[in-house]
From Swiss-Prot:
GO CC entries: cytosol
Family label: Belongs to the lyase 1 family. Argininosuccinate lyase subfamily.
Alphabetically ordered keywords of this record: Amino-acid biosynthesis, Arginine biosynthesis, Cytoplasm, Lyase
Superkingdom per UniProt: Bacteria
Enzyme class: lyase
Recorded catalytic activity of this chain's protein: 2-(N(omega)-L-arginino)succinate = fumarate + L-arginine
Lyase found in the keyword field: yes
Organism for this UniProt entry: Proteus mirabilis (strain HI4320)
Name this polypeptide is given: Argininosuccinate lyase
The protein's annotated pathway: Amino-acid biosynthesis; L-arginine biosynthesis; L-arginine from L-ornithine and carbamoyl phosphate: step 3/3
Major site of localization recorded for this protein: cytoplasm
Length: 460
C-alpha cells in the first residue's frame, strides 16, 4: 500500500507506478533506513509519542529486519512497494501490527531519504578512502622495488628527460593523496543530520535534533529545514571527487597501457589482469587497464547529469531528486572497482629494466644536461639552449647520441666544452643532479618513499 493514498479516488496507472517507483535502486538504502528508523523511534519516546516498551518492540523488530536484509538484500526487489521507506514500514507493520504505523509520526520521506543517503555516503567515503590508501601502498611498494629502474620521462609523448619507474609510481601516489584528502574534506560538510526537518518546514514535535544527530553518528544537525531536505551538495561533492579520482586512474591506466605496448616494452603485465584474442593467438591484451580508462566517462557523466538535475530546482523537495541515486551508486561502485583493479594490476607487474634504460638513452633526453653544463661554464641559458639545439641537429644527422660525438665535434659548437662533459651526459648524472625536493635523484626518491611509508603507516 502507498503511504499517500487517502487523498486519491483513483488508483495510479500501472505505467506511472513503474515510472515513479524507486525500490529497484533505493533498496540499497535499506540498512540506512532501518538505522534511521531506530534513532527516530528513540526520539519519539522523548516527546511522548512512544512509550519505552513500544520503542523497544519497534527496535527489536527493526533489528530483526536488518538481519533479514543482510542475509538476502535482493529479496527486497520481490516487493511491489514504491520505495525503500514504504518497504521498511510495511515489513515493520507485518511484525508488530498497528504499532508500526506510529513510527512515521513527525517524519517525512523528504528528511528520511536525505538522512538515508547521507548515511550511505558516509559509509562509502570510508570505504573509498581505504581503497585509495591500499592503492597508494601498492604504488609505494612498487616504487621501492624499482628505485634503480631508469626510464624516459615524457612531455608531449616525446622523450624528454630520464626519470625512474619509482618516481613515476610516486607521482600517482601524490594524485591519490589529493583524492583521499578531497573525500576527507567533503566529509566535514556531509556529516550533518537532516532528520527532524520534516517535509520542508521542520517537525511539529519538540525533538532534540542534536541528540538525534548523535544517535545517528553525525557530528551535528542541520540548521535550516528547507535546505536540509533539498540539499544534495554532498552528492555533487562525492561525484566530483569520484570524477577527479577516475581521471587520475584513467591517466594511470593510459601510461601503463603505453608502457606495456610493443612499441615501448617497459613492463610486463601479469596474466591475472590480461586477456587474449579470439582470433590472434599471440595477443595479451591489457583489458583491466583499458576498462579502467573506459569507465572514466560514465563517472564524468554521472556528475554532469546531477549538476543538470539540480540547477533549476526551486526549494524545497522535488521528485527530480529521486534521480540523485542511480548515477551516484554507479559512480561510487565504478570508482571503487577501478581502485581495487588498479591495485591488482600492480601486483605481479614486472619492469623490464634493460629495455627501460635503453629507451632512456635514446631521444637525446640528456640534452638539458648539456645546456646546464654550459650554464655552469658561464654561458647564459638562452644561448646555451640554442647551442645544444644545434648540437642535437648535428647528432641526429650523424645518427649518434650526444655522448657518442667526439670532443672535437662538440667543441665546434662551444669552446667551453671539455672532456668532463661525457660524465655529465651519463644517465646517472642526469638523475643525480635533481637533488631539489621532489626531484628524481636517488636521494630524493628514497626520501619520498620513506615519507610515504610513514604517512601510510606501512612500517607498523
Amino acid at each position: 500500500m502507498a503511504l499517500w493514498g487517502g487523498r486519491f479516488s483513483q488508483q495510479a496507472d500501472q505505467r506511472f507506478k513503474q515510472f515513479n517507483d524507486s525500490l529497484r535502486f533505493d533498496y540499497r538504502l535499506a540498512q540506512q533506513d532501518i538505522f534511521g528508523s531506530v534513532a527516530w523511534s528513540k526520539a519519539l519516546v522523548t516527546v511522548g509519542v512512544l512509550s519505552q516498551d513500544e520503542q523497544a518492540q519497534l527496535e527489536q523488530a527493526l533489528y530483526e529486519l536488518s538481519e533479514e536484509v543482510t542475509a538476502n538484500p535482493h529479496s527486497i526487489l520481490q516487493s511491489d512497494a514504491e520505495d525503500i521507506h514504504s518497504w521498511v514500514e510495511s515489513k515493520l507493520i507485518a511484525k508488530v501490527g498497528d504499532l508500526g504505523k506510529k513510527l512515521h509520526t513527525g517524519r517525512s520521506r523528504n528528511d528520511q531519504v536525505a538522512t538515508d543517503l547521507k548515511l550511505w555516503c558516509k559509509e562509502e567515503v570510508a570505504h573509498l578512502r581505504q581503497a585509495i590508501i591500499e592503492l597508494q601502498k601498492a604504488l609505494v611498494v612498487t616504487a621501492e622495488q624499482n628505485q634503480h629502474a631508469v626510464m624516459p620521462g615524457y612531455t608531449h609523448l616525446q622523450r624528454a628527460q630520464p626519470v625512474t619507474f619509482a618516481h613515476w609510481c610516486l607521482a600517482y601516489k601524490e594524485m591519490l593523496a589529493r583524492d583521499e584528502s578531497r573525500l576527507a574534506d567533503a566529509l566535514t560538510r556531509l556529516d550533518v543530520s537532516p532528520l527532524g526537518s520534516g517535509a520542508l518546514a521542520g517537525t511539529a514535535y519538540d525533538i532534540d535534533r542534536e541528540q538525534l544527530a548523535q544517535w545517528l553518528g553525525f557530528a551535528s544537525a542541520t540548521n535550516n529545514s528547507l535546505d536540509s531536505v533539498s540539499d544534495r551538495d554532498h552528492v555533487l561533492e562525492l561525484l566530483s571527487a569520484a570524477a577527479i579520482g577516475m581521471v587520475h586512474l584513467s591517466r594511470f591506466a593510459e601510461d601503463l597501457i603505453f608502457f606495456n605496448s610493443g612499441e615501448a616494452g617497459f613492463i610486463e603485465l601479469s596474466d591475472k589482469v590480461t586477456s587474449g584474442s579470439s582470433l590472434m593467438p599471440q595477443k595479451k591484451n591489457p583489458d583491466a587497464l583499458e576498462l579502467i580508462r573506459g569507465k572514466c566517462g560514465r563517472v564524468q557523466g554521472a556528475l554532469t547529469a546531477m549538476m543538470m538535475t539540480l540547477k533549476g530546482l526551486p526549494l524545497a523537495y522535488n521528485k527530480d531528486m529521486q534521480e540523485d541515486k542511480e548515477g551516484l551508486f554507479d559512480a561510487v561502485d565504478t570508482w571503487s572497482d577501478c581502485l581495487h583493479m588498479a591495485t591488482l594490476v600492480l601486483d605481479g607487474l614486472q619492469v623490464r629494466r634493460p629495455r627501460c634504460e635503453e629507451a632512456a638513452k635514446q631521444g637525446y633526453a640528456n640534452a638539458t644536461e648539456l645546456a646546464d653544463y654550459l650554464v655552469a661554464k658561464g654561458v647564459p641559458f638562452r644561448q646555451a639552449h640554442h647551442i645544444v639545439g644545434e648540437v642535437v641537429v648535428s647528432a641526429i644527422e650523424q645518427g649518434k647520441a650526444l655522448e657518442e660525438l667526439a670532443l672535437s665535434e662538440l667543441q665546434k659548437f662551444s669552446s667551453k666544452i671539455t672532456v668532463e662533459v661525457y660524465e655529465i651526459l651519463s644517465l646517472q648524472s642526469c638523475l643525480d643532479k635533481r637533488l631539489a625536493k621532489g626531484g628524481v635523484s636517488q636521494q630524493q626518491v628514497s626520501y619520498a618513499i620513506t615519507e610515504a611509508k610513514k604517512q601510510l603507516n606501512m612500517d607498523e
